[in-house]
Amino acid sequence: MFKTLKHLLALLGLILPLGLAATAQAAEPTRFTVEVRGKGPDVILIPGLASSRDVWAATAKQLEGRYRVHLIQVAGFAGLPAGGNAEGGVVEPLADEIVAYIASRRLDHPAIIGHSMGGFTALLIASHHPESVGRVMVVDALPFFSVLINPESTAETIAPQAAGFRDMVLGQSPEAFAAGQTRTMEGLIKTPAARPQAVAWSLATDRGVMARATYDVMTNDLRGDLAGIKTPVTVLYARDPEMGYVYGIVGLIYESNYAALPGVKLRPVNGAFHFVMLDQREAFAAEVETFRH
């Protein structure tokens, strides 16, 4: 009997390391890569749709002397192969993999700063995995994007329009897509010198990943989850007279859509379009310092 028990224990000793190795391997992200800089409390930076991690270059430089900065690059965006994002949904699986990354690296309630789709992803993590995150900064993103298309939108009513947009992106010729991205960046970035790089990131993005990620953002409504979020959340939003009529109501849009989130801090950044960190670098850096303290 003891001999048999010894053999079982020996076998178990072989199996356990294999199992642990498999678990560690499973925790390796397939939907993003990460570049880690600095030492200290952990801060995760998530870029927006079709953006490179380099959109956070100035922020990473600002923080890396005092914090350990985790720069996310979403698979399929800005030249990175699609990897695990090659098919199916993008945003929710991305959030789940970031949570797995936090757990596997034993990060202690990291702060997360996310822009646009990255901000939505950060909200998703805070609402569905509150144990994983310490605080969140959302940069120019709403809990339900599609209210910007129609304030009465629901996830169900917007789905056909979201599917149509997804299919349009997939069906465009390279020339039409490039022209469209150039026009789009004129409305998203106020600083002309910053636009060409953002356009280049978009053109290097896997269009299938972009289209499906856009569909995800358009059809996922987190407003009903806000009341349950206990994580401290700061929301920065762009505000500029060149936005036209939106300039006068953007504050109300953010206030009404985040009304259910306890203790949310809503902070306008004047003189910026959607890429706040590129248009108002000093103001954005100051907001990051306030957020971290």
Question: How should these model regions be labeled?
Answer:
Residues 1-44, 64-68, 89, 108, ...:
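Alpha/beta-hydrolase fold catalytic core
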Residues 35-83:
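Conserved HGGG/HGGXW glycine-rich cap/lid loop of the alpha/beta-hydrolase fold
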Residues 37, 70-113, 117, 127:
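Active-site loop/oxyanion-hole signature of alpha/beta-hydrolase fold enzymes
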Residues 119-130, 136:
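Short glycine-enriched nucleophile-adjacent loop
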Residues 134-171:
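Flexible "cap/lid" loop of the alpha/beta hydrolase fold
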Residues 147-148, 153, 168-225:
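Conserved alpha/beta-hydrolase catalytic His-Asp/Glu region
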Residues 232-272:
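Conserved loop-alpha-helix segment in the C-terminal half of the alpha/beta-hydrolase fold
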Residues 269-281, 285:
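Catalytic histidine-centered segment of alpha/beta-hydrolase-like enzymes
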